[in-house]
Amino acid sequence: LSFCLAACCNEIIESPESKSEDDFTSKMGLHILGSNDTRSSISPDEDQIKNICVMAYDEKDGRLACAQTARSADEIEMELRAGTYNIYVTANMGEFDAPIKEQDIGDAFHSIEDIAQLGQALPMCWKDRTVLKAGEKTTLYAKLSRLVSKVDFSVETGVLEGLEITSVRLCQAAGVIRPFMEGGS
């Protein structure tokens, strides 16, 4: 007994092996938008970025697909498989310890050991969801949010005779920041 099967097709169907890696990957860059919502009257450079960390989590399985730390957003370029990603960005926190599973991102933290650690570059963050298409470069436009505020206090005692300041106290200064915790840190 013999059996024969034949088919006709007008189009050539490419097998996945015949496609190049570029047909499945996408490049992602980052651009930081200026923050005009809050500006300092004392130090105009508080929005500067000394370092930035970008983490991309695959929406399908919630796992870390890529993480990069750089001195500026211009240095960030990720190559990822086409798909949907949740992107998390931290600034001025050094190399952020990105968890492997996205569900653990709320527990990730940054410690502030000393107020001098903040300098003029305040910790900031941003998150968003993006779809990356195969063979295309996508630029994300991030508007970072400050995670701390800085208060400078100065008094000219010569203006008011008899004024004597005995103490100044700052309450509720964060020692730990959890930038992506639901409801704040």
Region locations from a protein language model:
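Sec-dependent N-terminal signal peptides
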Residues: 1-3
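C-terminal motif of bacterial Sec signal peptides marking the signal peptidase cleavage site
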Residues: 5-7
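Short, low-hydrophobicity acidic/polar segments
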Residues: 10, 16-21, 26-162
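Short helix-loop boundary/capping segments
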Residues: 157-185
